[in-house]
Amino acid sequence: MTRPTVHVSLACWPGLRHDQAARHLASDVVEPLFGRLCTDHVQLVPQNFGVLTEAMVDGLMAAFPQVRFRLHANVRVLPEHHLADLSGYPAHREWFRQAARISRRLAAPAYTAHAGARRDATMAEMLEHTRRCADLFGCVVGVEGQYPAAGDAWLVSTWPEYQRLFESGVPYAIDLSHLHILACHSGVHDDALVRDMLACDRCIEVHVSANDGHGDWHQVCEQPPWWWPLLQYINPKAVVFSEGNHRRKRTP
């Protein structure tokens, strides 16, 4: 199988400022499973430190004119921290408006965010929030599904909910490390659904990293996981990002 082109997420360097993490784009970023990572598209993420201001994104675009940057999840765009997921879209209007301004300044082709908490919205409401968010951002906005957690806290954290997302007509991102947690928790590997979701042209991003099936540890992929053969079905328009931590390796 030909391995896919995998792009850099600044989640590879958590805890650094956005501009500090971006300095790594000037050097080759290599992973054991995916080889040299591509920098045509790069995610700006909440794992990095500090406020992502207009001036900072202008500096990033000037320093790396060949890179198409895009925002992911609740990256910090305001001085105050906001846990802004799609389920809570109405409660975080200020954050979403500022994120949309930053995204438009980047001329970003897409934005992806987590589905969020059940306490904030029903599945149908969250999907409608995603459509409204796309209108605000002026680009494609995709829902990133989640995984089982205590108290059944997260939307899109079961196989039936992933099926419903797939059938909704709304764009989405597939985080394969989240699906690994779901598979370990449920005892089910729904390869057919994962294949179909990856192949669909509404899959705008695919996120890869490794974990032990119990937590979203964002480790670098070193060995082929169960979903490795399914990568061949990724539709050519989807951008694949590695979110593996290049700063430190988690020990058991």
Where are these regions (language model features)?
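N-terminal pre-domain/capping segments
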Residues: 1-97
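Histidine-acidic metal/acid-base catalytic patches
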Residues: 2-10, 19, 32-33, 93, ...
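Active-site beta-loop-alpha junctions enriched in small/polar residues
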Residues: 9-15, 45-49, 72-76, 116-118, ...
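Distinct, well-ordered alpha-helical segments
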Residues: 21-23, 27, 54-58, 121-132, ...
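Hydrophobic "anchor" residues on beta-strands that sit immediately upstream
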Residues: 39, 68, 140, 171, ...
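Conserved beta-strand positions in the central sheet of alpha/beta enzyme cores
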Residues: 41-45, 112, 142, 173, ...
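Short, well-ordered coil loops that connect the C-terminus of an alpha-helix to the N-terminus
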Residues: 66, 108, 139, 236-237
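Active-site acidic/histidine proton-transfer and metal-coordination neighborhood
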Residues: 82-174, 228
